[in-house]
Amino acid sequence: MVSGVTYLKRGAVFGSGAFGTALACVLAKKCESVSVWHMNANEARVVNQKHENVYFLPGAPLPANLTFTADAEECAKGAEIVLFVIPTQFLRGFLQKNSHILRNHVVSRNVPVVMCSKGIERSSLLFPAQILEEFLPNYPIGVIAGPSFAIEVAKGMLTNVCTAAADIDMARKIQRIMTTSDGSFRCWATTDVIGCEIASAMKNVLAIASGALKGLGTENNARAALISRGLLEIRDLTLALGGTGEAVFGLPGLGDLLLTCSSELSRNFTVGMKLGKGISLEEIKRTSKAVAEGVATAEPLERLAKKHNVHLPICHEVYNVLYANGCAKRSFKKLNSCKLADEGLPALPRTSKM
């Protein structure tokens, strides 16, 4: 049993996709009741009747103390911790409509707020926690990041993640709330918030590259090289944006990159596999219920790297394949034909050569 964990009466989760549902299952072990906001009232009723999120996480029975609701205010009322797991590109719209609810029921009671969404907003090039900060200025916001496939989390399989906040005491507070007493979901605290957000976004783009390698017929050696060089790209952007780098070689960076780049449970990896086999992005979108996060992230990541003059060669080639009529085979040939260089682990970001 893990000592020092915190129990609450009520938790709230905004966002009912696979990961949001999985985190709600974790909270259900720590709270007397958990409410999950789902945008469709009819679907919320179906989930409550079946005790299973048949829309986004089938096969994982939901705890009896977990309920879905389409009423954002009902979800927030009385919550002692609030998690956000709304897709990044829809987060601002939700906050524009419902930020008053957060101010009335969350901020006024000094409730911990934790961002669990991953990606980069196209219009602003902001990360999810930065978007939330615009609506809750000067309010402490935490982040959860790390290797965590939703189905495994929901089923209580062993998972380790990081809780991050600018104030280490806040990160540790969230850590105590989210860590389960049986240790099946364990959190490690850090202050490298921007590092966690960058790693969470970039690993999805790099997973597309890894899947494309698989689709092209390569095996383990090539994937190991891609993960290693991809990790340096995460590090370079993290340092350029003011991160400490602590998260890069821990669970949010190396841990999540290893997981997402190596398993067909990752939607990003499977999208990459299809691209590597020559299937177009349009066809992938047409035949998929949910598009992988890395597809939406690759374009704003390309612009963010240029803005900060950081060279991200692998992520750049993913962008080319997705949005510039590129070809996976040509992109990897280009990457493997680059000028010979030292391995090196420079302390400062490499300057852009794009």
Curated annotation (Swiss-Prot):
<dbReference type="InterPro" id="IPR011128">
    <property type="entry name" value="G3P_DH_NAD-dep_N"/>
</dbReference>
<dbReference type="GO" id="GO:0005829">
    <property type="term" value="C:cytosol"/>
</dbReference>
<feature type="active site" description="Proton acceptor">
    <location>
        <position position="203"/>
    </location>
</feature>
<protein>
    <recommendedName>
        <fullName>Glycerol-3-phosphate dehydrogenase [NAD(+)], glycosomal</fullName>
        <ecNumber>1.1.1.8</ecNumber>
    </recommendedName>
</protein>
<feature type="binding site">
    <location>
        <position position="90"/>
    </location>
    <ligand>
        <name>NAD(+)</name>
    </ligand>
</feature>
<keyword id="KW-0520">NAD</keyword>
<dbReference type="GO" id="GO:0005975">
    <property type="term" value="P:carbohydrate metabolic process"/>
</dbReference>
<dbReference type="InterPro" id="IPR013328">
    <property type="entry name" value="6PGD_dom2"/>
</dbReference>
<feature type="binding site">
    <location>
        <position position="267"/>
    </location>
    <ligand>
        <name>NAD(+)</name>
    </ligand>
</feature>
<dbReference type="Pfam" id="PF07479">
    <property type="entry name" value="NAD_Gly3P_dh_C"/>
</dbReference>
<feature type="binding site">
    <location>
        <begin position="15"/>
        <end position="20"/>
    </location>
    <ligand>
        <name>NAD(+)</name>
    </ligand>
</feature>
<feature type="binding site">
    <location>
        <begin position="267"/>
        <end position="268"/>
    </location>
    <ligand>
        <name>substrate</name>
    </ligand>
</feature>
<dbReference type="GO" id="GO:0042803">
    <property type="term" value="F:protein homodimerization activity"/>
</dbReference>
<dbReference type="InterPro" id="IPR006168">
    <property type="entry name" value="G3P_DH_NAD-dep"/>
</dbReference>
<dbReference type="InterPro" id="IPR036291">
    <property type="entry name" value="NAD(P)-bd_dom_sf"/>
</dbReference>
<dbReference type="Pfam" id="PF01210">
    <property type="entry name" value="NAD_Gly3P_dh_N"/>
</dbReference>
<feature type="binding site">
    <location>
        <position position="118"/>
    </location>
    <ligand>
        <name>NAD(+)</name>
    </ligand>
</feature>
<feature type="binding site">
    <location>
        <position position="150"/>
    </location>
    <ligand>
        <name>NAD(+)</name>
    </ligand>
</feature>
<keyword id="KW-0327">Glycosome</keyword>
<dbReference type="InterPro" id="IPR017751">
    <property type="entry name" value="G3P_DH_NAD-dep_euk"/>
</dbReference>
<keyword id="KW-0560">Oxidoreductase</keyword>
<comment type="similarity">
    <text>Belongs to the NAD-dependent glycerol-3-phosphate dehydrogenase family.</text>
</comment>
<feature type="binding site">
    <location>
        <position position="118"/>
    </location>
    <ligand>
        <name>substrate</name>
    </ligand>
</feature>
<dbReference type="GO" id="GO:0020015">
    <property type="term" value="C:glycosome"/>
</dbReference>
<dbReference type="GO" id="GO:0046168">
    <property type="term" value="P:glycerol-3-phosphate catabolic process"/>
</dbReference>
<keyword id="KW-0576">Peroxisome</keyword>
<dbReference type="InterPro" id="IPR006109">
    <property type="entry name" value="G3P_DH_NAD-dep_C"/>
</dbReference>
<dbReference type="GO" id="GO:0141152">
    <property type="term" value="F:glycerol-3-phosphate dehydrogenase (NAD+) activity"/>
</dbReference>
<dbReference type="GO" id="GO:0051287">
    <property type="term" value="F:NAD binding"/>
</dbReference>
<feature type="short sequence motif" description="Microbody targeting signal">
    <location>
        <begin position="352"/>
        <end position="354"/>
    </location>
</feature>
<feature type="binding site">
    <location>
        <position position="293"/>
    </location>
    <ligand>
        <name>NAD(+)</name>
    </ligand>
</feature>
<dbReference type="InterPro" id="IPR008927">
    <property type="entry name" value="6-PGluconate_DH-like_C_sf"/>
</dbReference>
